[in-house]
Amino acid sequence: MDWRLIIGEGNVYWNMALDEAILLLREEDKIENTLRLYVFNPSGVTFGYFQKIFESINIDFLKKNNIGFTRRITGGGAVYHDANGEITYSIIADIKFFPIDIVESFRKICSGLIETIKMFGLNAEFKPINDIIVNGRKVSGSAQTRKRKTLLQHGTLMYNTNLDILARSLIVSKEKLIAHGVKTIYERVTTISRELGYKVSKENVIETMVKGFEKALKINLYRDNLSKEEEELAKKLLSKYMSKEWIYRR
């Protein structure tokens, strides 16, 4: 089965607008199933649709350091997207391709990341509902939304994320850390480079992610460009993701 592969980068607002644009156009059968691999440049923070902003992210720190932030249309928690240490993936595809059960659909899509991590010589495991763990620490998290015919799942793969900035950008309650059996965020999360003991490159990670998703999902990815309609719709949605009404709605 052939899927489109879109590789690119953009700021936090553009990336979220583009994911929604692709979702809406896939729902109308105007585009094919798509895997998008992208970088947040400059670095940014996204947080879940249902989250309360003042309980999720450190707004003062983000503003002082010119780190953009916005709310996602998907659930899940707050994420720091490092321009030099994290690749985000999004899968927008026919909902029939995935199990109806939410956990099993997460498991199927995350298998692409698990294959990727294995190709670096590390053991990874899926931890429901949406985490991937390496040596007991989180290296990836994902979030999902569904329309009638289409599923969107996007998530992270931290390969060299600055964990100090991550820790300062997000608000993680002591209760949540305790629930995971750790005291600090440094014990809770990790990166591929940290686990390997040497730095891996962005290009290597992207190339390996392509192979990992092809193997796990049994698909053939072909490189493609955004259509004019995708770009135009994303531009229209951009104002939504930049608006205070959307960002501060909860």
Tell where the protein language model's regions lie, with residue ranges.
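Active-site loop/lid in soluble adenylation, ligation, and acyl-transfer enzymes
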Residues: 1-60, 64, 72, 176, ...
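Glycine/serine-rich anion-binding loops at beta->alpha junctions
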Residues: 66-87
